[in-house]
Amino acid sequence: MSQLSEQELVRREKLAKLRELGINPYPADLYPVKNTSKSIKQDFKEGNKVVIAGRLMSRRIQGNASFAELQDAEGRIQVYFNRDEICTGDDKSKYNDVYKKLLDIGDFIGIEGDLFTTKVGEKTVMVKNFTLLSKALKPLPLPRTDADGKVHDAFTDPEQRYRQRYADLVVNPQVKEVFVKRTKLFNAMRDFFNDAGYFEVETPVLQPIPGGAAARPFITHHNALDIPLYMRIANELYLKRLIVGGFEGVYEFSKNFRNEGMDRTHNPEFTAMEIYVAYKDYNWMMDFCERLLEHCAIAVNGTTKAKFGEHEIDFKAPYARVTMADSIKHFTGFDITEKTEAEIREAAKNLDIEVDDTMGKGKLIDEIFGEKCEGNYIQPTYITDYPKEMSPLCKEHRTNPELTERFELMVCGKEIANAYSELNDPIDQRERFEHQIKLAAKGDDEATEFIDYDFLRALEYGMPPTSGMGIGMDRLIMFLTNNQSIQEVLFFPQMRPEKKPLAISDDAKSVFEMLKKAEKLELIDLKEQSGLSNKKWDKTIKELTKNNLAKVEKTDEGLFVGVV
């Protein structure tokens, strides 16, 4: 346990005093909340009796009276504590001792009171009785505002905010609004699908084969079955199995996991939505997608427009449609149509794009598009008709066998949706899988290394013409809430392990300080400078090396100790 601050020690002393007074600082009883800060303000009527509960966020004590702010799930309300209103008899200890001396900012309290308006027009609760519901032992990281209105000590450090999201939500109300909008997005999308008659389903998170995408999976082991299992990287192949089974429209909000890098737009655990509808194609899905996103934008923000950085995005349908070949030709002057792999590789080099021999034709085209085209699409734009090599699960284009019936939706230079006319020819699908294995063997890190034979068996029973679409929910809510980082739209993003201060002995600290000044010393000299006995010296040097603070090196000149 880390050392307690002075404030934390004082709060623990108050906790003990409360218990001495017979007050349970963490009561189990239900508290009969009848009102919220929002409902009080909306339905305000002078003299009305209310019962509210929340967190004490500020207070100004002036002798026998005190104004304070109470924060609940819907906002803040001013409350007024008056000693004689709370303590109507001779015993004034509830105000003088409990409220004034033993409560702190951050404590949860329940309040019974009457409504009134202050002289300056503030809607306020006159406290008639209060109950301590939970004692806070750690002070909140609240900002201070000085006489000039400048804010100090604001809780804005991103790493601290993500690690302590619970504190972030309390002291930064705008953060909570992001997650309220996130829930609105999920609800709006779910309603849209349900109204269309599609079924929400659940598919396995632990899978025997990591299929449906090319990504590095998290691997675990099932002890009872003695087999490896993979955390889901995508749910596509299971949803298609359900189309084979007779469902004509299925969707799932899935937690997916990819054991890859982290940056401003990628988290190892993320949320995707995938939907599959029988008897449709990618043209229908484009129409469906833009109607869906227009509906969601209005549900989240009340308008189809959303600010993102310096851009204003408009999700109002319809969206522009551009083929990948036309996009590359427009931005580079190079026409990829009917070009060989060697010609495309040479063109990429001429465009100063880093390529290597492991890249096949599809990967090369993807690199050109990513480097030269993708970032130019700010408003929602469909990029369509991808090369077959880039889309192993997608149906061959009806008029050009080199292409597939696929689109990606670009917004602000990023892909937020990916959709196909799904491949339902089991023989073609098997050949595509086998080709992917060959690409993976060449070193293509975006090619899949597994063949899902059970999925092929399902296709052999027959799958109707189907269109499917996946949407990155985290990225979509980033655009709808003007957040540049995925960490801002996840309650608890993945973080590196928190660095904790090492607890080492005083002797080890003293020796380490000596070592830091010199960086490297002969072991015998360091021991002599330390003045420690043989026993204490052995213990100290072991402690420093064990905690990776120092290392002992043997050289021709003797034993030396250095700082790690």
Model-derived features with residue positions:
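Class II aminoacyl-tRNA synthetase catalytic cores and aaRS-like
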Residues: 1-503, 550
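Short, solvent-exposed alpha-helical "recognition" segments
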Residues: 545-551
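Hydrophobic residues on short alpha-helical segments
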Residues: 508-515
